[in-house]
Structures are given as structure tokens and as C-alpha cells.
Amino acid sequence: MAIQSKYSNTQVESLITELLAVLEKHQSPTDLSLMALGNCVTHLLQNKVPAEAREVVTEQFAKALSQSVKNS
């Protein structure tokens, strides 16, 4: 999603691979997978992002997600 990241491609790809493996293990259909991942995002935003930054971080995340879907 990000043009520049403080994380290596290896770190990102490893995490993605593990997350997708869990969804596959549970034979999760696309809608359930998106619901679960969305709930994970909500949990992270509510518990790991300071309240005063949540709106901006949420907007940045949504914009990056939208752009990544358009560019694929």
C-alpha cells in the first residue's frame, strides 16, 4: 500500500502469508475474510492508535486501501 515503508518487503510478505494461511485453514469465504480483517483493523485503530490520531489514520488507511485496489 505505502510507497515508502519502514518495513522490509520480507516482513510485510511474511505477515500477509501467515494471515492468508489462517483464512485458508478456516476455508473462510471472501465476505467473512473481509469482515474479520475489517474487525482486526478496527481493533488496532481503537487499541493501538491514540484517540486524537484515529480519524486521520483511518482516513489515510482507507485512502491507501482504495488506491491499492484501483492500481491492481
Swiss-Prot record:
SUPFAM superfamilies recorded: YejL-like
Protein name: UPF0352 protein swp_2271
Entries under NCBIfam families matching the protein: PRK13689.1
Classification via InterPro entries: UPF0352, YejL_sf
Family (UniProt): Belongs to the UPF0352 family.
Pfam families: DUF1414
